[in-house]
Amino acid sequence: MEVPAKIQKRIERLRQEINDHNYRYYVLSQPTIPDSVYDELFHELQKLEKKYPETITPSSPTQRVGAEPLKVFEPVHHEIPMLSLDNVFDEKGLRAFDKRIRQRLKLDKPFEYVCEPKMDGVALSLLYENGELIRAATRGDGYTGENVTQNTRTIASVPLQLRGNDYPELVEIRGEVLMPREGFAKFNREAEKRGDKTFANPRNAASGSLRQLDPRITAKRPLIFYGYLIGLLKGKDFPKNHCDVLKWFKDWGIPVISEIKVVGGIEGCLDYYEHLVKTREKMPFDIDGIVIKVNSLQVQAELGFVSRAPRWAIAYKFPAQEKMTVVKAIEFQVGRTGVVTPVARLEPVSVSGVTVSNATLHNFDELYRKDVRVGDTVIVRRAGDVIPEVVGPILAKRPKKAKLIKIPSRCPVCHAEVIKPEGEAVARCVGGLYCRAQLRESIKHFASRRALDIEGLGDKLVELFIQEKLIKDITGIYQLKKSAITALPRMGEKSAENLLTAIEKSKKTTLPRFLYALGIRGVGDTIARTLARHFHELDLLMKASIETLQEIRDIGPVVAENIHAFFHQKHNAELINKLIHLGVHWPQEKAVVKSEIAGKTFVLTGALKSLTREEAEEKIERSGGKATSSVSKNTDYVIVGENPGSKYEKAKALGISLIDEEAFLKLLKS
């Protein structure tokens, strides 16, 4: 289909506007529109590109996300090695660095240095050809890194196409990938809620995010890139000074740290260092010192390199923000998803101006690796200047009777069994629905759209019901009384009636939805449908052995153990029986009969008229098929609805059968 000239012009205009706003946000730090307006522009572009897929280009802002997961990172040879810097830790060492340079150049007078914050992130090389990003690679050992292009494309601050026209034929931009402190804290909070692994500090988070085999995971991480150096350069001469290189970066749309300063001589470097020592905690990301570079690129070339580091640059590291204290106790906290976390209770100590009396030990693998015990004198650090953590014990000061901490066999809150699956770092309480520590999130999950879908039972109302002790476990939802609800603040009769109607309506559900609502770790809606299709009845599933569960497609040993442990916890069985007694019910799952759908894999793209996406996927699963979210060579059918996305084009390219809604409904009837 030919793209109307007016549409093509609008698409190009949208791309330009979005790229300009990215530039203003990430490079100039001067956003001119609110996020909501930016989102509207982005969604309009997405919609037009879906309708006219032939207009999509690799450098379009919409093409940052969506690549298939990788099996392995390809090695990348650095034509110019990515060397590390030598370090100094005091004024004497810095002055010695300056003296060596001036002696080598036979200069008595001071000359210009460029001072920059030393970012505590992950080094990254970006290669642009004719302005287009063609490759991104990690430092690795300095000579060989890993190709992380697909992941890097998802980082919003990395331009897929350089701005303007005054860029070289080929340029390698080196810099650092960071996770800002605010984004790091938010990521860890959300990971804790989901029961996922948290990161110890922003640097680990940035590194782990950049090295995900699935770019879609990287896309969800709050990463930012700052450029600081040019490696390869073809088709353009180097400028006179390093600060001119940084100006190039800004002109091309590459973010550069604003705290960079050109100083005259080593005294200026020392002043800059003292300034950053005082202001480092106000910065949005972690730094662990300053980097000092000779400003003149000609002088840099004269000085050259020694071993694995340049002679013309040095890192002046900050003193470690660590203190010693004593572990008074090690207690266990239970998270909302049952994760049991060891926490060290400490003799209060001031670290970076903050009194620290508690510090996370992250998980039991970390606890045993560090071998921290009650009574130990330990080194405490504020990880990322924010989260207190125990670095490790000073073994020479360990009391003779200090004992190794054991994983608790029972939950400190509900006294249910605590299990630590082989290969996992975390231990979990299997108390599930009965454990009060997990109650709040369990209720929210139980009422969510893909579960029992109780309209109106939102987060704030759940908090209020628990606070007022109207709900003590999930069964309490079905025992709420109108009089008790209307007695609450801002809850009138109409609101109470609407909520009770929604609760009553939720009693009629399906077995897959009920299984998903129970919140068993590892059992999402797809696994829930698989279990319902396999067992047909809840009783049979509750009696299934771990071995039987492992024989089912898509269920591995860890999920099988989670399911078995959940149903064999007495409290969970009692709560399930009580829910059924209170009226929660579902039609019996029918055994899958032989059909055109059985054994086939389906992907949906676009909107269907007669079914929601969830309903269509449920019908596929109940007919013996499998519904997946991405197109691959293993896909049998792609169901094409209104306004299909890129999956439609990919299916056409792979020669996969495309069917419309009418054909899909006929298959269901077969």
UniProtKB/Swiss-Prot annotation:
Gene Ontology biological process: DNA repair; DNA replication
Binding site for Zn(2+): 411, 414, 429, 435
Active site location: 118 (n6-amp-lysine intermediate)
Coiled coil residues, start to end: none
Keywords: DNA damage, DNA repair, DNA replication, Ligase, Magnesium, Manganese, Metal-binding, NAD, Zinc
Entry binding sites for NAD(+): 35-39, 84-85, 116, 139, 176, 293, 317
Catalytic activity field: NAD(+) + (deoxyribonucleotide)n-3'-hydroxyl + 5'-phospho-(deoxyribonucleotide)m = (deoxyribonucleotide)n+m + AMP + beta-nicotinamide D-nucleotide
GO molecular function, one term: DNA binding
Named cofactor requirement(s): Mg(2+); Mn(2+)
Disulfide bond residue pairs: none
CC per GO annotation: cytosol
Function: DNA ligase that catalyzes the formation of phosphodiester linkages between 5'-phosphoryl and 3'-hydroxyl groups in double-stranded DNA using NAD as a coenzyme and as the energy source for the reaction. It is essential for DNA replication and repair of damaged DNA.
NCBIfam families from the UniProt entry: dnlj, PRK07956.1
Protein name as annotated: DNA ligase
Organism: Coxiella burnetii (strain Dugway 5J108-111)
Gene assigned in the entry: ligA
